[in-house]
């Protein structure tokens, strides 16, 4: 049986390994991910925020330690979020279908990349004829049961350019507060990075 000479085998093996490693790596580099995640918050908050990434197995990896109690990440379909500790508890409870903590939390989603969400169904993953899908664009969220006391509109069909309550009547009801002008609209999907 013919064999490859060592002079060919080693470079060929290295190319094969590099190709396999490259094919297995998905998503942005850590540096790219950090930059994307930090785009969710104002610069003053982003400078001292932690950056975390949820791995495919559900494990949270800290890419950068923080100093101000905020954690920034890329979520779902690429949306960027920067949340304080109370908000992180709120979203953890939501993910586990558990009652949220009785604490107010602040979350920034300022990057302008918003794939939207159901205004009525906390676990809806896509638009349907009756789940009142809304795309808000850049916004902040006030989460926690006390957010109801803000007195914002709680209709199901909202104007996403004005503050409103999302997921009304569920334990995860929270305030959505758009920022920027009413002309601020998310970029088309093809233009998003």
Question: Can you annotate each of these PLM segments?
Answer:
Residues 1-11:
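Bacterial N-terminal signal peptides that target proteins for export
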Residues 9-19:
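Bacterial N-terminal signal peptides
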Residues 25-193:
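Primary mode marks residue(s) on the alpha4-beta5-alpha5 output face of response regulator receiver
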């Amino acid at each position: 049986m013919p064999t490859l000479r060592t002079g060919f085998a080693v470079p060929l093996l290295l190319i094969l390994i590099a190709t396999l490693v490259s094919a297995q790596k998905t998503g942005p580099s850590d540096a790219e991910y950090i930059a994307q995640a930090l785009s969710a918050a104002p610069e003053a908050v982003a400078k001292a925020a932690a950056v975390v990434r949820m791995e495919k197995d559900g494990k949270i990896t800290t890419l950068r330690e923080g100093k101000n109690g905020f954690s920034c990440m890329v979520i779902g379909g690429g949306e960027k979020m920067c949340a304080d500790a109370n908000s992180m508890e709120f979203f953890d409870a939501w993910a586990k279908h558990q009652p949220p903590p009785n604490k107010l939390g602040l979350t920034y989603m300022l990057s302008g990349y918003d794939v939207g969400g159901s205004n009525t169904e906390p676990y809806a993953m896509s638009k349907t004829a009756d789940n009142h899908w809304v795309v808000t664009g850049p916004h902040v969220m006030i989460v926690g049961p006390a957010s109801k006391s803000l007195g914002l509109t709680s209709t199901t069909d909202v104007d996403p350019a004005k503050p409103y309550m999302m997921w009304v009547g569920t334990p995860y009801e929270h305030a959505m507060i758009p920022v920027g002008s009413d002309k601020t609209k998310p970029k088309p999907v093809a233009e998003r990075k």
